[in-house]
Amino acid sequence: MPETGSTVRCKGEKSMRPSWDAYFMEITHVVAGRSTCLRRKVGALIIKDKRILATGYNGAPSGLAHCQDVGCIREQQQVPSGERHELCRALHAEQNAILQAALYGVSIQHATLYCTTHPCVMCAKMIINAGMKEVVIVKTYPDTMAAALLDEAGVTVRYLEEPSAC
């Protein structure tokens, strides 16, 4: 089971080993850096037994043009965040991580998903059906139905604090 909390190393302090949560969330933020979305940079990591099974970030399907190259229809139509997901050409980070595990035949049942933001309702349903047991996040998302579904399915959602600056 991952430990809670994180380690922040400030100038002049001895280097400390980060908790598992801090370690995995830091990797999740690095994964988010690969995102090609013009609106949000989201990363996801699927973990089981302290091992990384799959990663994902939000972006266009493999082989297709990226939003950063062709523009964002949601931006052009001024669609608010959290609405009209079907207009987006990208997959969400959570979806990409789940698909990567499936593509390579990796079971993610009883796994933990680390994500830079709370899953939307579409991703929540995929997390539930994939049999994941826990979601660990640092940012909320305006989707109360997603939170309600995860709760109803018995999927634990834990919030981590963002590391503070020194």
Model region roles, listed by residue range:
Residues 1-166:
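Zinc-dependent deaminase catalytic domain
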